[in-house]
């Protein structure tokens, strides 16, 4: 089997050296070239035809976003962004994902060499995932038209969504058409701390419903979406007749915190047939067992189809476990969620 060919673009010679060490330490990949800026990278891409590009967000001569935008228009390829953990860095990274980057890794703020080498396995996994990603499915998407929701039967209805690689754009596409009369939406997207708040704020500006980073103990309200904070698990809980959010530091599940399985299992327990579950693009199997639990509890469950996924991992696993009611294209997910929950069809007979 041929190795994954990687090209790294970073203005820091140290970062280029570290990325080369990391990539070449894995037997299934190799660093074919490195570039100090996008202009040099342009020529190296033509020369080496890499499978995956790692790209620093902030560089001289041409910044990473400008280069990414041109690259995705002229020569689409899998890109993993390398970002700082600053507030500005998180906003720029989210814009990069919108432009078509597959995923991102964050630079440690102190001890770059030790920090990056500690991330070695995670970086390699993101490169592997990017190499398998469906680039055609990751073209920037126009804002969908607002849908109309039928009358909610009760405030007990809610929607739970889980996603990973490619999920930030998929979630935007699902939330943007939702009207103010939508039921509550609770979302777990695999994302490190420092990024989920920026992600929620970005969505809040784009959506009619209110979108925020979830807080422990807050009441779950219709017309609102709640994003699990990075490096924290989020669960649905009950407080009398109301739903409540529970945030905690439990151990990683399926190597993830937040974990989609943790969210879905809690929704199965506390909402059951009053819920609709949605599993979107992502690598691995997180959420598959939780979706099966939701299905067995009477929830209607939706998986994104392979053609519209960046990575058809999590949806495939959920389908294979037998916990999916229907498989639909990303463009139809919002409509199906509202149709099932508004008509009371979250209850399966």
Swiss-Prot record:
Residues 152-344 form the CheB-type methylesterase domain. It comes from the Bacteria. InterPro entries: CheB-like (IPR008248), CheB_C (IPR035909), CheY-like_superfamily (IPR011006), Sig_transdc_resp-reg_Me-estase (IPR000673), Sig_transdc_resp-reg_receiver (IPR001789). GO terms for biological process: chemotaxis. Residues 5-122 form the Response regulatory domain. Transmembrane segments: none annotated. The keyword DNA repair does not apply. GO terms for cellular component: cytoplasm. It is an enzyme of class 3 (hydrolase). SUPFAM superfamilies: CheY-like, Methylesterase CheB, C-terminal domain. NCBIfam families: PRK00742.1, PRK12555.1. Involved in chemotaxis. Part of a chemotaxis signal transduction system that modulates chemotaxis in response to various stimuli. Catalyzes the demethylation of specific methylglutamate residues introduced into the chemoreceptors (methyl-accepting chemotaxis proteins or MCP) by CheR. Also mediates the irreversible deamidation of specific glutamine residues to glutamic acid. Contains a C-terminal catalytic domain, and an N-terminal region which modulates catalytic activity. This is Protein-glutamate methylesterase/protein-glutamine glutaminase. It comes from Salmonella choleraesuis (strain SC-B67). The lineage of its organism: Bacteria, Pseudomonadati, Pseudomonadota, Gammaproteobacteria, Enterobacterales.
């Amino acid at each position: 089997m041929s190795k994954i060919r990687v090209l790294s673009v970073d203005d820091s010679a140290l970062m280029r050296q570290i990325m080369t060490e990391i990539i070449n330490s894995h037997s299934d990949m190799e660093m074919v070239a490195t570039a100090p800026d996008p202009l040099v990278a342009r020529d190296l891409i033509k020369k080496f035809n890499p499978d995956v590009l790692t790209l620093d967000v902030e560089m001289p001569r041409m910044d990473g976003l400008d280069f990414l935008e041109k690259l995705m228009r002229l020569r689409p390829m899998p890109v993993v962004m390398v970002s700082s953990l600053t507030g500005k860095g998180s906003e720029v990274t989210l814009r990069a994902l919108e432009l078509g980057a597959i995923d991102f890794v964050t630079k440690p703020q102190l001890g770059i060499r030790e920090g990056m080498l500690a991330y070695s396995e995670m970086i390699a996994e993101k490169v592997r995932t990017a190499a398998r990603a469906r680039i055609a499915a990751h073209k920037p998407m126009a804002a969908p038209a607002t849908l109309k929701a039928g009358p909610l039967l009760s405030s007990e209805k809610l929607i739970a969504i889980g996603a990973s690689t490619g999920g930030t754009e998929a979630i935007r596409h699902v939330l943007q058409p939702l009207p103010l009369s939508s039921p509550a939406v609770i979302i777990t997207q695999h994302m490190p701390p420092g990024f989920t708040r920026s992600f929620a704020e970005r969505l809040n500006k784009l959506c009619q419903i209110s979108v925020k980073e979830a807080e422990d103990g807050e009441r779950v309200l219709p017309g609102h979406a709640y994003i699990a904070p990075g490096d924290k698990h989020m669960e649905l809980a009950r407080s009398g007749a109301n739903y409540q959010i529970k945030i905690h530091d439990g151990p990683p599940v399926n190597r993830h915190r937040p974990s989609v399985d943790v969210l879905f299992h809690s929704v199965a327990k506390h909402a059951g047939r009053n819920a609709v579950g949605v599993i979107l693009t992502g690598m691995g199997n997180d959420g598959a067992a939780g979706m099966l639990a939701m299905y067995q509890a009477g929830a209607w469950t939706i998986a994104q189809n392979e053609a519209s996924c960046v990575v058809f991992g999590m949806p495939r696993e959920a389908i294979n476990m037998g916990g999916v009611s229907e498989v639909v294209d990303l463009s139809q997910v919002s409509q199906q969620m509202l149709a099932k929950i508004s008509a009371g069809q979250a209850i399966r007979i």
